[in-house]
Curated annotation (Swiss-Prot):
GO CC entries: outer membrane-bounded periplasmic space
Keyword hit for Transport: yes
GO molecular function: carbohydrate binding
Cellular localization per UniProt: Periplasm
Record's protein name: Uncharacterized protein HI_1028
InterPro entries membership: DctP_fam, TRAP_DctP, TRAP_DctP_sf
Keywords linked to the UniProt accession: Periplasm, Signal, Transport
Family: Belongs to the bacterial solute-binding protein 7 family.
Signal peptide (UniProt feature, chain positions): 1-25
Main location: periplasm
An individual GO BP term: transmembrane transport
Amino acid sequence: MKLFNFKKLSMLIAGFTLVTSPALAEISLRFGYEAPRSDSQHSAAKKFNDLLMKKTKGEIKLKLFPDSTLGNAQTMISSVRGGTIDLEMSGSPNFTGLEPKLNVIDIPFIFKDREHVYKVLDGEVGQNLLKDLEKQGLKGLAFWDVGFRAFSNSKQTVTKPEHIKGLKVRTNQNPMYIEAFKLLGSNPVPMPLAELYTALETRAVDAQEHPIGIFWSSKLYEVQKYLSLTNHGYTPLIVVMNKAKFDSLLPALQTAIIEAAKEAGQFQRDLNVKNEQNIISKLRKQGVEVIEKINTEPFKTLIEEKVRKSFIEKHGDDLLKKVDALSE
């Protein structure tokens, strides 16, 4: 009888040890974002989770919350800083209130092409900008992709600045974009993405400017029939994590998170480039007039120099020079 009890006790202890072993404990991280499930951001988030589970042998997994389930971008960023959400991704303009130097990314026409974008974001300039978020309680993991921005409206074809004059244009809350659209003679109306469709449908605003991937996935083509590929700015996504949570993890897990985030970001960039022409074709089938080739020089003349000057007055010209130098 004593032998039986000893064996039983040994089995219970072994089972308890197996269940509570840190190596087998699963860490579940909440990851929120505004984009709907149909967007490449959601595809990349799933890829991020797959990579993370593989790299950590299942120790870390992501719980995904797309489509503004946990609030708009600003709400989610605050929640990540407060620790109620673990990770969040949204366009860089949403972070400029915390780190104003990020405004350099949003200066109109600052980027020559995607190659220029990647040199900046994946190099010293971009990595330093991510690091600057740490003093705000955020660990910047990687830059993902929203894309070059296009202009849509419900009034007319837009091929020159005067076509924008007087329109109520939804912009993000970034001061660079607000200033730029004021210089074009429009009336900028900052609002979250989650409110945009209804605002366009009810004509509370006449126009908006987003990369075409968002225009498609958010079904804005249902309420906007004129789209001009102005490429007036490029917007990256920034994937952030609560810094205290990140710091609490073992170094090997930290490395896995950063590696998985960067690899998923490259996956999403490639996916967006691949999808662009397909989206344009689908938009035309939905009755959207898409203008692909536009002379952007008149737009640049009105806004580029003045917005650059505003940035230099606040932050100096060193960062701007570094970005310009990488266009070669």
